[in-house]
Amino acid sequence: VAMVLTMAAGCGKKEDKKDYFVFYVNNELTKVVAKKITLQHTSSGKAQVKELLKDLQTQPEDATLRRTIPRKVKIQNIDLISYQITVDFSKEYYDMKPTEEILTRAAIAKTLLQLSQYVTFTVDGKPLVDASGANVGAMNLDSFVENPGEQINSSQKATLKLYFSN
């Protein structure tokens, strides 16, 4: 009997835990850094979105990184419809400086894009606009360009010879 119970215990459904990445902004506000995690919620959907957002709201163990979502910015609502996640933030989202906002937006979106094809942000129920007032709209992985250099605002100077034909 004990052997049958032992065998039956091993036949239970094993939940596969998948590794995900949470993206954090470094303290110098120059790049986004990925840290691997394993989600506790194995079922897809809103529970996973909430878990990832909670990780983005906490201070990472790595002292060179900052929490992605600033403490004063609150998540007011989360919608998960078809292939799109919409996150509504409090008005304090707009208190970030432009560089911090862009890196924060990239880190949140890249984290959530592991669960959906598109991510949209709203602030107090209205579509997110950037520093120039343009509507940001739905974001996907193609919305972000990786900067291979260390500096976000780096530039290069070169002398070139240009040849023109008539």
Name what the model sees in each region:
Residues 1-6:
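Bacterial N-terminal signal peptides
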Residues 10-166:
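Bimodal "functional hotspot" detector
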